Amino acid sequence: MDLYEYQAKELFASHGVPTLPGSVATDSDGAKAAAEQLGGPVVVKAQVKTGGRGKAGGVKLAENPDEAKTKAEAILGLDIKGHITRRVLITTASDIVDEYYFSFLLDRANRNFLAMASVEGGMEIEEVAATKPEALAKIAIDPIQGVDEAKAREIVDAAKFPAEIADQVVEVVVKLWETFVAEDATLVEINPLVKDPQGKIIALDGKVTLDENASFRQPKQAELVDKDAEDPLEAKAKAKDLNYVKLDGEVGIIGNGAGLVMSTLDVVAYAGEKHNGVKPANFLDIGGGASAEVMAAGLDVILGDPAVKSVFVNVFGGITACDAVANGIVQALKILGDEATKPLVVRLDGNNVEEGRRILAEANHPAVTMVDTMDGAADKAAELAAAGA
């Protein structure tokens, strides 16, 4: 789960990482009030979960509260890379002497944690890595040993931070590691980490990604979810404990097991090339349980997507046998009733497949078409989607 900048900086501050005072506003009057409370020049910053805010006009300096109100009016509602700005952060303006970069992240490729640091901050780190790779220090972090002052010093030295700020940066690194671990994050990033004219180090901007798999021990994660920004179908699926990701196609996908679902996306995309370019509309893995309730919940979510023109149910019977899956589909269609109007292509294979096919055949539901092979079923689902588009 990605956080907004203001949420990230609140987490930083709670762990002792130095940040500037700020307040969030959802309208221009609130922005003016926040600027009045802070006093002096402020920066009005769009709160969206994407980069490039400055180039898009989403970050503006305001010299006084009235100007903060005007700048907030210009930013609120701004579309930044498809993200609509619904709130702004009003924060104290700061003069900047130098800009740096620092992050901790989960290094999935090496199954480890990684620290990345650079004295070339303030720009996209991908740009630094591409144009000046020697300016980006990467240090592997042992998850057992973690980051103490000595390890933080090693990181700071590797990145060649100036000696006059090294002690401050070491302290920030230790506290940022505490944030990373305590909050179950997969990314904590400060860009830029700045030095002000007084020589003080400040986290001027922040990015945090939290591991939602840790929500059972991080109850406050629920308070950080932005209900307005969440896709309504994904929110509905999440409420039903379904592993669902919305895509931009026309063929709804239900499968059991992430690998099978990913393969299904591929074969549907390939089949769609012959049928007006239709594509998969979602990823939905129902896992090992294909009960009537789970199947009904999955179909309810997928059929709620107006872009979906057909649904492909692709199940390989293992621990959950095909007859149980078939019964689940039949019961799900009864539960959904008149809502189950879009064509449903079902491919069953594996444990008790013949019994599963018999159950579906006897149910004789007008929306259901059975196809024996995965490629054939994908082709049929794509054909039906193209016809209904």
From Swiss-Prot:
Which GO BP annotation is one of this protein's?
A: tricarboxylic acid cycle
Q: What cofactors does this protein use?
A: Mg(2+)
Where ATP binds, per the record, is at: K45, G52, R53, G54, S94, E99
Task: State the free-text cofactor note.
Answer: Binds 1 Mg(2+) ion per subunit.
Sorted UniProt keywords: ATP-binding, Ligase, Magnesium, Metal-binding, Nucleotide-binding, Tricarboxylic acid cycle
The UniProt entry, under Gene3D superfamilies, shows:
ATP-grasp fold, A domain, ATP-grasp fold, B domain, Succinyl-CoA synthetase domains
The UniProt similarity line reads: Belongs to the succinate/malate CoA ligase beta subunit family.
Name of protein = Succinate--CoA ligase [ADP-forming] subunit beta
